[in-house]
Curated annotation (Swiss-Prot):
It is found in: Host nucleus; Host cytoplasm. Keywords: Activator, DNA-binding, Host cytoplasm, Host nucleus, Host-virus interaction, Inhibition of host innate immune response by virus, Metal-binding, Phosphoprotein, Suppressor of RNA silencing, Viral immunoevasion, Zinc, Zinc-finger. One of its GO terms (biological process) is symbiont-mediated suppression of host innate immune response. This is Transcriptional activator protein. The zinc finger and the transactivation region are involved in PTGS suppression. Residues 120-135 are annotated as: Transactivation. It comes from the Viruses. Multifunctional protein that modulates host antiviral defenses and promotes host attractiveness to insect vectors. Acts as a suppressor of RNA-mediated gene silencing, also known as post-transcriptional gene silencing (PTGS), a mechanism of plant viral defense that limits the accumulation of viral RNAs. TrAP suppresses the host RNA silencing by inhibiting adenosine kinase 2 (ADK2), a kinase involved in a general methylation pathway. Also suppresses the host basal defense by interacting with and inhibiting SNF1 kinase, a key regulator of cell metabolism implicated in innate antiviral defense.
Length: 135
C-alpha cells in the first residue's frame, strides 16, 4: 500500500519533548574565569570579542581584546597581575603661536551673490509661502 504523503522521505520526526530532553543533557561549552577580587564568571566558548567592567576594572574575554588592551606589547598569558602598571600620560604639545588668528569676512547688509535674484521677502505671496513650506 502506498503512502498518501507527498514526501519521498519517510523518516519519523523526533518529538519536541525528546529534542528538549537531549538539549538539556548537552554540556554547555563555557569556561570559568576567576578574577583578582575573588569573583568568578563563566564565559561561553563561542562568545568572542566581549569585555566588561567589574568594580572599576575592565576585563577582556578575547585574546584580540587583550592584545588591544595591552597595546600589543605583551601576551595576555604572561601578563603579570601583581605589578601595578605605571600610568603614562602623554601630553600633546601644541605650538605656541600668538596673534595668528585667521581674519573673518565682515558681515554686510546688502544682498549676497546667491540671493540677489530673490524678491524682497515682504513681496512674497501666500502661494509662495505655501510652496516653501511644502519643501
Amino acid at each position: 500500500m502506498q503512502s498518501s504523503s507527498p514526501s519521498t522521505s519517510h523518516c519519523s520526526q523526533i518529538p519536541i519533548k525528546i529534542q528538549h530532553h537531549i538539549a538539556k543533557k548537552r554540556q554547555v561549552r563555557r569556561r570559568r574565569v576567576d578574577l583578582d577580587c575573588g569573583c568568578s564568571y563563566y564565559i561561553h566558548l563561542d562568545c568572542i570579542n566581549h569585555g566588561f567592567t567589574h568594580r572599576g576594572v575592565h576585563h577582556c574575554a578575547s585574546s584580540n581584546e587583550w592584545r588591544l588592551y595591552l597595546r600589543d606589547n605583551k601576551s595576555p598569558i604572561f601578563h603579570d597581575n601583581q605589578t601595578q602598571p605605571t600610568t603614562i600620560q602623554q601630553q600633546i604639545q601644541f605650538p605656541n603661536i600668538s596673534n595668528q588668528v585667521q581674519p573673518q569676512l565682515e558681515e554686510g547688509t546688502g544682498d549676497s551673490q546667491m540671493f540677489s535674484q530673490l524678491p524682497h521677502l515682504d513681496d512674497l505671496t501666500v502661494s509662495d509661502w505655501s510652496f516653501f513650506k511644502s519643501l
